[in-house]
Amino acid sequence: MSQYHIPVMLSEVLAVLAPKGYESYLDCTFGAGGYSNAILNSCYCSVTSLDRDPNVIESVEKIKQDYGERFNFIKTNFADSFRKLKHKKFDGIVMDLGVSSMQLDIADRGFSFLYDGPLDMRMSVQGFSAEEFVNTADEEEIADVIYKYGNESLSRRIAKSIVEYRKTARIDSTRKLAEIVRYSIGFRKGKIDSATKTFQAIRIYINNELEELEQFLANVKNILKKDGRLVVVSFHSLEDRIVKNFFKENSEKQVARSKYAKDEIKIDPNKWLKIITPKVLTPSSQEIRLNVRARSAKLRAAKKII
């Protein structure tokens, strides 16, 4: 069997998802194929995977060779996925949010300030790029994006520096943008680079990540079978808050009830989830040592009860 990338919190995802033979699963973020491969390898089930990144095709073909008709891939984003799935329902759904290691490690994709490359950041390699945004948006819009999506308290100072710099030269590389940010706010103490929040914010904005997540969750009930499980791995507080609130709003509060009570339990049809991770799960210290990118991961899961 071919070797596959090991995704974040794989053992925890499999334990919560609990794949069973002859059931069908949806991997919403294929990436390098780690979750899809692990689910298919765990039992004789089928997996449908989604991804908007055209660069995943090599990994897609590898899984097709290993698993044949048990695996199906659809090139799409969250917003268009329901139309392309054509009302198909699944026994379990897994979502690994944010940018993949594969995308971060390719300099030409422009996601990371660790590599000097074109300032792109588009997951689908189509549409508005990060370079276009930082060179055309006004100062207030840039500041708002960095503050809203990066939780960056010094967003206005960064935005001012970006606008001042582009008066003399175009900002067309990850190195240039990172240097502008570091120069404007200085180096911060600790392990996190000063440019981290700005890069995160622009990437989220360019790819419409939070809006697409909200749209997918609003419709996920229609493609999840009864007793099916939804497992979500997020990597920053904005994503995690959306998932946490969605689970809370759609789940019944558990109340202790006497076994002698004769009244029938009424189920609110709007409360269709049961949370199966009362406390958010995080990576083990061993996993973080092996993969520092796992340090911010959070896993939440729920089961459809009606």
Swiss-Prot record:
EC number: 2.1.1.199
Family that this chain belongs to: Belongs to the methyltransferase superfamily. RsmH family.
Pfam families the UniProt entry points to: Methyltransf_5 (PF01795)
Regions crossing the membrane: none
Catalysis: reaction(s): cytidine(1402) in 16S rRNA + S-adenosyl-L-methionine = N(4)-methylcytidine(1402) in 16S rRNA + S-adenosyl-L-homocysteine + H(+)
Subcellular location: Cytoplasm
GO CC, any one term: cytoplasm
Main function: Specifically methylates the N4 position of cytidine in position 1402 (C1402) of 16S rRNA.
Sequence positions that bind S-adenosyl-L-methionine: G33, G34, Y35, D51, F78, D96, Q103
Alphabetical GO biological process terms: rRNA base methylation
PANTHER family in the cross-refs: 12S RRNA N4-METHYLCYTIDINE METHYLTRANSFERASE (PTHR11265:SF0), S-ADENOSYL-METHYLTRANSFERASE MRAW (PTHR11265)
NCBIfam families in the cross-refs: 16S rRNA (cytosine(1402)-N(4))-methyltransferase RsmH
InterPro entries in alphabetical order: RsmH (IPR002903), SAM-dep_MeTrfase_MraW_recog (IPR023397), SAM-dependent_MTases_sf (IPR029063)
GO molecular function, one term: rRNA (cytosine-N4-)-methyltransferase activity
Protein's name according to its UniProt entry: Ribosomal RNA small subunit methyltransferase H
Keyword Phosphoprotein among UniProt keywords: no
Source organism, top-level taxon: Bacteria
Key words, A-Z: Cytoplasm, Methyltransferase, rRNA processing, S-adenosyl-L-methionine, Transferase
